[in-house]
């Protein structure tokens, strides 16, 4: 079902991408279509956030409209997660499509439509499938994190199978109080990470575990965590280039999309 969903979403983007190619000589029209593509990609990523948090769209909108009128502390934390996720993922979607545009521009002239579509597919199906899963997983972990008390002991665990990366396995069993748990170790800590956290009532592992973090080479893309109000994909991600940050059309698109989401 997940693969089918990813493919259906790609087909929506592909349709818009073909329109983009047909209007590429018309700069204004092409940018308008690019905004449609970025909006689609953003909506698909936000959908993963809602799925991971077990939240429907109406509840998400209701939370976003609230400011200080929360019924529970959980509602406030859920809203904080939604805001952090949306802020990060609008940027991410725009940066991803800009990376696609740059690859198109870097290829030889008169590239066939099939090869152009292959580039679109690489970003919006193959890469997107992995990214969608990471976003879904980050949201699920964030939702679980909300329910843990600050005093609870959190232990890092792997799936324990042959697919586990060695350096992930080296982290298994590391335990901290929630209040001290490093954001860098809240899954996902890398693309395609399947590690998870569990509560542990014992404190015996903690003293031995805490010094380890200082010597670890953590993937900088995942140095923050949605669970603690950070970004899923940090500024270290290859999409977030200086060229992207300085492209005025893209920054205007980002502002408009965020405004629409907050206004809802």
Locations of regions flagged by a protein language model:
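N-terminal leader/targeting and assembly helices and adjacent pre-domain segments
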Residues: 1-119, 201-264
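Conserved short secondary-structure elements within globular domains
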Residues: 128-192, 196-203
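Active-site acidic/histidine clusters and adjacent loop/turn architecture
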Residues: 91-154
